[in-house]
Design a protein with these regions (language model features):
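Phosphate-binding/catalytic loop of phosphoryl-transfer enzymes
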Residues: 1-67
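ATP-binding/phosphotransfer module of carbohydrate and carboxylate kinases, centering on a glycine-rich
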Residues: 2-10, 53-198
Length: 198
């Protein structure tokens, strides 16, 4: 194996960050992502939920196509008006938005084009994170361990990401993690501590 890359969704001191870390055979370390939802978090649960909300309001405005999400999200939240939806989203923390990601999966499972595009964007973001770290490490061949909640439990994101990565970086192969996400997060924290990264 030429090296290994780990998409790690959780860091011990921060919640819901998409971060890819890798190390090559020479022991060099590279990281991509982990910037948080206010800066850049493509492929995260928050991003999927935010994009699902955007699809709904675009339909309501007449700027976007009809989407099943405009039925699923208000039904899940018990909101009947745009004002109630706004109050829900802005009345809590970001976990409220991230909690909507499974509805994007539900809509994608029914062939909803807006939801499928949300997954295309999310998988492209994850692929870009992996290939950026791999490029900095000079890795053309290696393994990518799929760690974290979404990649473990969201079939659509996992399938879209693995297919996108296979097309764009055929030498990087997705593998099941050798340990659980908590162990991966601990390893990531140690790697970052050794490298002096925040």
């Amino acid at each position: 194996m030429g090296g290994a890359l780990r998409p790690a969704r959780h860091r011990p001191h921060r919640r819901d960050r998409v971060c890819v870390c890798g190390r090559n055979a020479a022991g060099e370390f590279a990281r991509s992502g982990g910037w948080g939802h206010l800066i850049d978090d493509g492929g995260s649960g928050y991003a999927l939920g935010r994009d699902a909300l955007a699809a709904v309001v675009r339909q309501w405005d007449g700027r976007g196509e009809a989407t099943l999400l405009s039925e699923l999200i208000p039904a899940q939240l018990g909101t009947r008006t745009p004002q109630e939806l706004i109050a829900y989203v802005y009345g809590g923390d970001k976990s409220r938005v991230a909690a909507l990601a499974p509805l994007a999966a539900q809509a994608a499972g029914q062939g909803d084009q807006a939801a499928l595009r949300i997954y295309e964007r999310g998988s492209a973001e994850l692929t870009a994170l992996v290939t950026a770290a791999a490029d900095r490490l000079g890795l053309r061949v290696g393994e990518v361990a799929l760690l974290g909640g979404l990649l473990s439990h969201d079939r659509y994101l996992r399938e879209a990401f693995t297919a996108d990565l296979a097309r764009k970086a055929p030498g990087l192969r997705c593998v099941e993690p050798r340990q659980d996400a908590a162990a991966g997060a601990a390893m990531l924290a140690l790697d970052m501590l050794r490298e002096g990264q925040p």
